[in-house]
Structure formats: structure tokens, C-alpha cells
């Protein structure tokens, strides 16, 4: 494992668990038919990088095992050394939710990790920011054009006067009107908007731009102070609207500019974990390294969020035993059941996940993807569960229920109070968020070389034996502290690569 494959390209595969009957090819570009491994395995055909090879002969109907779990059944006879293509893998049924073990294997607490801090912005509510941003919230999509024009003016004319303010970020969304505002599920987008407006990186400064006739009243977002609300219909013409927005913004910029970074305990961090453009290496390099870093963060008192219901659902039987109590375990199951029902309403098929890119990277189905995805959660006890759009109010490892969409998940983690996100990718994505730093970790060395000015940390070294999971986990942990302190900038922030917010609205649009 310690060999440098980038120089001599010695053939190598990775078998995760001792009972696995499949392994993935490590070598860049894959390996040709006839390749002989040190164990005597001979490839019966060309196998692409990251794709699975059979370690034993498999008869039709036999279990295909990876991560020590059944990821499918052989649809036909597969000879030892053959490429296990997606078409040869019949997906198993998802775990039944009514008889899962609850809180029966709760990990023992580990010694506290002391002596680590970061330089953050202290807020009046006790939270801390990793950035110092003026966030401007909208109550309805109708005002976006006016706000965008105003933000351009703010950045050009006002922001240079206030060097301690990092940015001005408009919080756009598609909600606010033409929606069933009182439908039961409307609570999800509404509380998401409410919590986004009070994000820790906005320093307690709330500013809401509304139209004046929308269903989502601005008062529901900024309920504490009418001075935080500006209604366009109260103004005589466009110029007056812009002038009022600029004046309202400058009042807040003055206050934000007076803020300075102070030493904060790691317990003030709320770290979101997410993966996008996953591949077969995600579950053996980047995600386990992030999981190791997550354990370090939990030991240091931080809040860590892992998410993506559809990429947890097929591994839920591995999570409910880690719940700190039966109540937390039941909350996990409740979120799975709600999402199962939501998908049935849309007649959605589990086979819709993974994506074509995931499959090209070696993932056969959502079961295999889920088993790799949950590695991000590390090994800590699961101390709580958040519904979509809820704000985190406790420390430790939390499951924040979100869809798997990068953009929806990122938005909901921001609403939970996330002040920095760690994002793993195998295929590569330029994804970023304006409201919080996004630290990107590659699953493969070749991606980190190909996108050297987009990837922050290379976890592909784990696959080649040049670094251990622990090594990269500590690197991620220390980089989180550097980015949170403003000592280091992520590539996404350096280039200004910021995706739009995307609300999760399961309620009807009228």
C-alpha cells in the first residue's frame, strides 16, 4: 500500500472489509485484461478506475458485498476477476424501518480534545461567525431584480468604506407568493428563510426587503423590529427604493465594520458535511477522513451536521444503533419515513440516485452510495436530529434531514446555523456558498491535480498509501480552524464561486 502508484502504476485494488467479495481498482485509467495482482487475482477484462472487480466466483443470485454489507445480488454468473458492471447488480430492498435496533451500540465518549480555538466573530446570541457579512433577506422573489441592482451599488459605493466587512450577500429564493402558505409542509420553507436571516455570519444584523402584498409577510422573518423591514410598494419609484436600501444597508455596515475577530472555542463551530459528485473512492478516502475530522470536532465540543436523507436511508440500520437514546433513534426513523412518503407522492424511484457521474465513478446503486456517504459521520454518538430548516441548538453529531441535492442541502445546513462546510467530491464540482466557507476534499489524487485551483485537500493519497485516514483527518481539522479564523481562504471563496440558495418546498404551489 505504501508504493507510489503515480510513478510505477503497480496494480492495486482496495477491499474495504474482510468479508467483501468485491474490490475497486485504484490505478488511474483503470487496468487492462490480464493484469495480475500480488495476491494472484487476474483480471478477466479491462476494468475502469474505481469500478468493482469480483474477488470470488459469483453465481446468479449471490450476494455482492462491499463495506461488509450487501450492496446487491448478481443478475448472472460473474467469474472471479471480472468487472462487476452496474447492469449485473440487482438492488436489494431498503432496510425496513419498523424493527431497527435503537441506541443499542452507542459509542463510548472519547476524551475531550482541548486547547484548540479559532478566531471568529462573537455574536450577541452567543453564536460565532467565520465571516463578517451583511446578509439581505427577501420575503418574495418579486423583489430580486431591485435588490440585485441595490447590492451592486452597495458593493461599488459603500463596501470599500468598511474594510472589516467581508461581503454583502442577497438571500434570494423562489418562495413568498403563489404558494399554499398555510399548508402543513409550508413550515419547512418558512422556517428556513427565518433561520437564514439570522445566520451567525451575519452578525445579528437582520435586513428584509419585501414587496408589500406577498403571502409571506416580512414580519414573519423579522418579527422583533420593524426597522429591519423595507417594503418596495411604500416607495415612490425605483430611485427611492434604491436610496432607501442603500441607507438601510449603510447603517448595518457601520455596525458590522466595528467587529473584530476574537478567540473562540471550537465548540462555537457548526460544521456541515456534504458530498457531491461522489464516486467509489468517496467511501474509502475522503468521507472516512472527514469522518475522522468530525470525531475530532465532536471531542472538541463542536456541532457537526451530516445530512442527505436519500443517501442515508439505505444505511439507516448502521445509524440508529449509534443514537444516544431511543428517542433520537425514533427521530431518525421519523425523518426517513417522512421522506419515503414524500418520494412516493412524486412517484420517485430509488434508482434515480445515483447520477450518471456517480455511476461513471464506479457506484452501482444508491445502497453502495449510502454506505460510502455515512462514513462522513465518523464514529461519534448521534446526539440529535433536525427537521429540514430547523436551527441546531445542541452540540455533538446531529443528523440534519435534507434532500441530497447539493444546493438544497447546503441551504438547509445554512439554516441550521452552519458556519463552515466540508464538501467531498470524486467527480469534481466548483460548488460554493456565499454565506459560509466551503472546504472541498477530493477522493482521488488525479482530481486534485486536474483541479489544483479548485480542490482544497487531497484525500486521494489515502488510496495510494501515501497518507492515512488519520493523517488527512487531522489535516482537515486544522484547515477548518485556519479557514474559520480567516487565516486561509478556500478556493471557492478565492474565485467567488457561490451557488444560489435553493429552498426545499414540499408544500403545493398555487
Curated annotation (Swiss-Prot):
One family from Pfam that matches here is SAF
The protein's matches in InterPro entries, at most eight in alphabetical order, are given as:
GarD-like, GD_AH_C, GD_AH_second, SAF, UxaA/GarD_SAF, UxaA_altronate/galactarate_dh
Q: Which CDD domains match?
A: SAF_AH_GD (cd11613)
Which keywords appear in this protein's UniProt record, sorted alphabetically? Iron, Lyase, Metal-binding
Q: What is its EC number?
A: 4.2.1.42
Where do transmembrane segments lie in this chain? none
Organism's domain of life? Bacteria
- Which enzyme class, named as a word? lyase
What pathway is this protein said to act in by its record?
A: Carbohydrate acid metabolism; galactarate degradation; D-glycerate from galactarate: step 1/3
Spell out the family assignment given in the record's similarity comment: Belongs to the UxaA family.
This protein is called Probable galactarate dehydratase (L-threo-forming)
